[in-house]
């Protein structure tokens, strides 16, 4: 009789202890963003001129892990830029390059460029990812809106100069 009682109790205790801490290798980690950079296609410098193409690149200081899909949406605050993103959706674990967009602003001024990246989780989610970091001229906001994906929003101001 005691064996019948102790066996299920022992099995339950063993199951609870084994679930106490998940192994880190099964945790999906979000990319850590270093900065958003801007580079002219024409001069290959950071001097951005109205009417000329430039590339906005979100640089990752650390790649993500166990992310099966990434979706990228580029925009600007005034919706005045012409955007041509390199990719809008990738299998992140196979293609974890820095997201980039080719943009043209036709008028000089200061514009806020934004990337909203959605990283679909294929392992265990990490709730400690939620935070906001400052970058020069902008910020990076990390969110976990559901246990199925991370959302990373990167915004930065770019100064567009008048054509010479």
Describe the predicted segments one by one.
Residues 42-48:
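Short beta-strand segments of immunoglobulin-like
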Residues 95, 103-107:
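Residue-level recognition of secondary-structure-to-loop junctions
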Residues 2, 13-40:
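Bacterial Sec-dependent N-terminal signal peptides
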Residues 119-126:
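Short acidic/polar inter-strand loop motif in beta-rich domains
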Residues 52-56:
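Structural beta-strand segments of beta-rich domains
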Residues 71-96:
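Low-complexity "stalk/linker" and mucin-like segments enriched in Ser/Thr/Pro/Ala/Gly
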Residues 58-63:
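Acidic, Ser/Thr
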